[in-house]
């Protein structure tokens, strides 16, 4: 019987419910259990694909092409699982499917209501995640905060789950905040008590409390919280601010969280103890890096940390492999000009230009890429970064001064980057990009092939609408650009590189989405190796 863990949050947002869910998932996975991660987002958008990065942060992409919440990236990296369309559900998706069923007549003329139709659909999504992944445990994070109007149907649905699948198969984990008042020099438990009271008022009794705090929570306060919330004191866990994400699951294990979960849900795990030896080695490495490598990220959304979270995580993963701390300096692409590029990049050891949409900042990207190419600074381009690297090469090496991307200039004569053929008649924006996992054939003797340890074929995740214009392939190759990765049908350019440079590689896909702390993605591994000048130092 599949077990279900629902992670909710109270008091304030951004408490780290996703990290809590991921940490529990990692511990259970390391006990030999198959874990499926799931995120419910209360917003009415179908998915975050059309949302401004400043509104939502990064859009994560799964193997099957789902555009999803960035928390799925945390799940994949921390738990080391692959997510799918069953892993991210929004209010928009729920209502869309309910209304489609109503239009088909599936409700036989009945009045469609939040209860039972919307709540039944939410429960169906939870159950479907279990069925389609054949999993032992589904861990579902409920976005938002207890008491939010938008979260109400989700809370009602997970309340009903306990009755429908049995209380022995459902566990509610509530993450809450214990603030420290510096003036009074004490922690306050009242917000937690009120949050649990609100949760209980809608019929959910939490089985475990995770107390987020910047200070250790004294035992007498845990006893008090237990008294007011009816949560056994042994099931009250503290989660302190940590210097590294790797600390969180280790702290949970020390507090016996995984054992409490398997005991509560009556799970007979294949391993009696979670094997966290490799995780501890990663934690030690992350805290005691010997070297430093400075990387400059030139992008469109640099003011928001979450906009490039997978990219920066992937850089750090590669840094662990070389025992080097990666110091990422982010520069707004719009701020870069021919006059200041030398000053802005004078101390960098590597340049990365990640993905994005629209025309803002393109000139700054091109200027920075030109400087990196001419001064042999290791460069990695991703998606839009690859497209701008191609435009830069056309303008400054092939001397096609009007070269551009059709996204920036639709009527451009030398459109080096063109709209994909199957996108020309596309009227909708949402969910219509080239999305998901696609193969690429790697050319022998290239840096790209070396990055992937000699593999002939790789599978990587994509999110784009434009592609390299194949009519320029021959001219590019004659001028020194190598097409080191091509789709199996030889149509779509996946990777370009200048092989005689220290490292100048750009990919149409998003390599950051498949990076893991203990397995850095190939292009990031090659990029940081070239930028740092260090040898691999395995931990």
Swiss-Prot record:
Region (Amidoligase domain), start-end ranges: 1-267
Positions contributing to ATP binding: 14-19, 71
Cellular component GO terms held in the UniProt record: cytosol
Signal peptide: none
GO terms of molecular function: ATP binding; CTP synthase activity; glutaminase activity; identical protein binding; metal ion binding
Keyword Ligase appears in the UniProt entry: yes
Binding site for UTP: 13, 188-193, 224
Positions contributing to Mg(2+) binding: 71, 141
Sequence ranges assigned to domain Glutamine amidotransferase type-1 in this UniProt record: 294-537
Binding site for L-glutamine: 54, 356, 384-387, 407, 465
Catalyzed reaction equations: UTP + L-glutamine + ATP + H2O = CTP + L-glutamate + ADP + phosphate + 2 H(+); L-glutamine + H2O = L-glutamate + NH4(+); UTP + NH4(+) + ATP = CTP + ADP + phosphate + 2 H(+)
Keyword Ligase included in the entry's annotation: yes
Residues the entry annotates as binding CTP: 13, 148-150, 188-193, 224
EC number of this enzyme: 6.3.4.2
Pathway(s): Pyrimidine metabolism; CTP biosynthesis via de novo pathway; CTP from UDP: step 2/2
GO biological process, one term: pyrimidine nucleobase biosynthetic process
NCBIfam families with a match to the protein in the record: PRK05380.1 (NF003792), PyrG (TIGR00337)
Main function: Catalyzes the ATP-dependent amination of UTP to CTP with either L-glutamine or ammonia as the source of nitrogen. Regulates intracellular CTP levels through interactions with the four ribonucleotide triphosphates.
Note, other: CTPSs have evolved a hybrid strategy for distinguishing between UTP and CTP. The overlapping regions of the product feedback inhibitory and substrate sites recognize a common feature in both compounds, the triphosphate moiety. To differentiate isosteric substrate and product pyrimidine rings, an additional pocket far from the expected kinase/ligase catalytic site, specifically recognizes the cytosine and ribose portions of the product inhibitor.
Family per similarity comment: Belongs to the CTP synthase family.
SUBUNIT field: Homotetramer.
Protein name in the entry: CTP synthase
The organism of origin for this protein: Lactobacillus delbrueckii subsp. bulgaricus (strain ATCC 11842 / DSM 20081 / BCRC 10696 / JCM 1002 / NBRC 13953 / NCIMB 11778 / NCTC 12712 / WDCM 00102 / Lb 14)
């Amino acid at each position: 019987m599949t077990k279900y863990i629902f992670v909710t949050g109270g008091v304030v947002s951004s408490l780290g419910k996703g990290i809590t869910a991921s940490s529990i998932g990692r511990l259970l996975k390391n006990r030999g259990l198959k874990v499926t991660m799931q995120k419910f987002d209360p917003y009415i958008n179908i998915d975050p694909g059309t949302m401004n990065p400043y509104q939502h942060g990064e859009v994560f992409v799964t193997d099957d092409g789902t555009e999803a919440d960035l928390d799925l990236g945390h799940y994949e990296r921390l738990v080391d699982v692959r997510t799918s369309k069953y892993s991210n559900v929004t209010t928009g998706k729920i209502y869309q499917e309910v209304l489609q069923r109503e239009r088909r007549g599936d409700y036989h003329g009945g009045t469609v209501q939040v209860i039972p139709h919307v709540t039944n659909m939410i429960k169906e999504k939870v159950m479907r995640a279990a069925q389609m992944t054949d999993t032992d445990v589904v861990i579902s994070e409920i976005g938002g905060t207890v008491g939010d109007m938008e979260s109400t149907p989700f809370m009602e649905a997970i309340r009903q789950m306990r009755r429908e699948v049995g209380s022995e198969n459902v566990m509610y984990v509530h993450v809450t905040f214990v603030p420290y008042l510096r003036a009074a020099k004490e922690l306050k438990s009242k917000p937690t008590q009120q949050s649990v009271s609100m949760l209980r008022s809608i019929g959910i009794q939490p089985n475990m409390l995770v107390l987020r705090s910047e200070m250790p929570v004294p035992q007498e306060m845990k006893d008090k919280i237990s008294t007011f919330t009816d949560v056994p004191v042994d099931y009250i866990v503290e989660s302190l601010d940590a210097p590294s994400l790797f600390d969180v699951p280790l702290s949970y294990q020390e507090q016996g969280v995984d054992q409490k979960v398997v005991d509560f849900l009556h799970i007979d795990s294949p391993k009696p103890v979670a094997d966290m030896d490799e995780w501890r080695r990663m934690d030690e490495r992350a805290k005691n890096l010997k070297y430093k490598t400075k990387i400059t990220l030139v992008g469109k959304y640099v003011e928001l940390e979450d906009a490039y979270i997978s990219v920066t995580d992937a850089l750090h993963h590669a840094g662990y492999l070389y025992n080097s701390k990666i110091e990422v300096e982010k520069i707004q692409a719009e701020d870069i000009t021919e006059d200041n590029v030398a000053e802005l990049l004078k101390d960098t050891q590597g340049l990365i230009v990640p993905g994005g949409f629209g025309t803002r900042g393109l000139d700054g990207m091109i200027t920075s890429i030109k400087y990196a190419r001419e001064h042999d600074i290791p460069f990695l381009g991703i998606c839009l970064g690859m497209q701008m690297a191609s435009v830069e090469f056309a303008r400054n090496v092939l001397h096609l001064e009007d070269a551009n991307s059709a996204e920036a200039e639709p009527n451009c004569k030398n459109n080096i980057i063109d709209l994909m053929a199957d996108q020309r008649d596309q009227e909708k924006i949402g969910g219509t990009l080239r999305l998901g996992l696609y193969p690429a054939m790697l050319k022998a003797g290239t840096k790209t092939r070396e990055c992937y340890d000699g593999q002939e074929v790789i599978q990587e995740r994509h999110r784009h609408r434009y592609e390299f214009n194949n009519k320029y392939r021959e001219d590019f190759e004659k001028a020194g650009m190598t097409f080191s990765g091509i789709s199996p049908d030889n149509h779509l350019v996946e990777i370009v590189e200048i092989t005689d440079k220290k490292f100048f590689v750009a990919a149409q896909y998003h390599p950051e989405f498949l990076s893991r702390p203990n397995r850095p993605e190939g292009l990031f591994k090659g990029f940081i190796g070239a930028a740092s000048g260090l040898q691999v130092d395995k931990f």
